[in-house]
Structures are given as C-alpha cells and as structure tokens.
Amino acid sequence: LKYSFREFFLPFKRLDLSYGWRAVENSKRAHYLETIGDKTIVVSGEGDFIYFDTNNFNSDKLLQKRLPSNLKQFLEKKNFTLMGLRDLHIDDNKLYISVILQNINEKYTIGILSSEFNFQELKFNFLFDPNMDIAEYSIGTGGRIVGYDNNQLLFSIGHFSVPDKVQNKKLLPGKIISINKENKNYELLSLGHRNQQGLFYFQDNTGNQFVINSEHGPKGGDEININNLKDNKLLNFGWPVASYGINYDGSNPFKSTHKEHGYQEPLIYFTPSIGISEISVKNNDDYNTIYASSLR
C-alpha cells in the first residue's frame, strides 16, 4: 500500500500546552470535522465553521470557505458563554454539536445544539439543554454524539469532576443516554462512567444491538465497556467506586473488582493508561473487530 501524507493548517487557534492541558483556553482550541457528500465540515472550539471539497486533501491547499452560523448570537441571547466543543455529528441532513457552556451564574453544563444543514447559514437551537449547574469547569465531560436507531441519538456525559453525582440516577454526570430527535426526551442507558470519549452503536450478525464506549480512567484504568441492549438493563460500570486505576496523588480508594461489588466489568482495561480515544466496530461474518485509537 502507498500512503500520501500532507499537513494542512486550519485558520483556527492551535493547542498550546503552556496553558496546561486542563485549561479552558485549550478546550477552545479543540476542533472537530465531519464529512457529508463530497464536502468536509470543520468547527473550531470557538464556534467558527468552515468547509471545503474533501478531494482538496489531495492537493496543496484546502481552499476552505467560511460557513456562516447564528451560534454565537444564539448563545448570547440565551445568556450562555461558549467554553468549548466536544463533538460534531451530521445525521439526516441535520448538524449537531455538543458544547460546554457557562451560564450567567458562572456554572457549567453540556448540551447539544442542532441546525438544518446547508451551506448558506446554520441556524442553531437546543436539542438537549440539561442546565446541570456544575460549580467548576472540568475536562471530564464526555460529549460524544453518535447515531442510534428509531430517530434517536446516543450521547455520553462525563463525570464533570463531581463524583458524588455519578451514581445518582436522577442526575446526568457519568451517564450514556439516548435522545429522541423529535420530542427531545431522553432515556438512561448506562451509568457509572468517567470520561467517555469514544462511543459507537452497532448490530451484530444476529441482529443484537450494542453500545460500546471507551473512557479515560484516572491514573491507569482506561476502559472499553460494552452494553448488550438485548438484556434491557440499566448497566452500572462502577465509577467512582470501582476502577483499575488510582488517583494521580497515589491514593487508591477504588474497588478493583467490579463484579463482586455489583458493577459491570469492563470488556477490557488498560493499566497503565493508553490515553484511549475514539472507538468503532467492524462486522465480519464470524466475529466483530473493535478499533480504538489512543495516544500510545
């Protein structure tokens, strides 16, 4: 196989580790892209959109064009400040973004905004606005959006550095939920998660449906977790009670065995951590292959 590598610089701010990897400023420097038809769409962490012909990856210049949107004006009208994005998803000619927001009381939340997709102007409204009122900014937000069945989306919500809320079924930190795109109602699919950066939905060759996710542990204990929806159970993956990692200060308050304490064991865990990221599954005739990216 022959590969061609080219480097392109987008007209957005680049990651700056001098701020520290937990800094809000770097959250605004995380950018996301998606393809639709023969076009590639990119959104910056500050909410600016561009697009270009995907074939331009094979040339010397992307020749990107600005894609206007009402995003900043809409959030200002709703008394929110954009603190960063967590995903971009295009489905059924609609564009969805997950956003970290600060309200006028300087509390934080995560939400999903949607717009009919076109190349003239994106006009956003809230699809999902839980207004979680988290006291402090956190990078452990999850925020992955993927397509699901029956006119629904899957959405991961991280621990938000509020571990006392993760095991509470009435609160959203540490959950994976499904959201109906029409009536905006949501349903819990699992809890006890930490920071689910990878999320994927698939059916095997027998028609069974699965949700698989990858999530960051503390120091060690990165996990891949799988939920067989055939069982129709609300699975609990154990955070912050059970983990195969330890705290960064060296303390270890966690139960290392999940099952013995009533929690779901991970499909696989990694200690030391690998910096796990996105995940996907490919169906084969006899088995399914899981692909996960990482910083290792």
Describe the predicted segments one by one.
Residues 48-52, 104-114, 165-166, 173, ...:
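Structural motif
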Residues 57-93, 131:
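Blade-loop segments of beta-propeller domains
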Residues 2-14, 42, 85, 159-296:
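Beta-propeller domain segments
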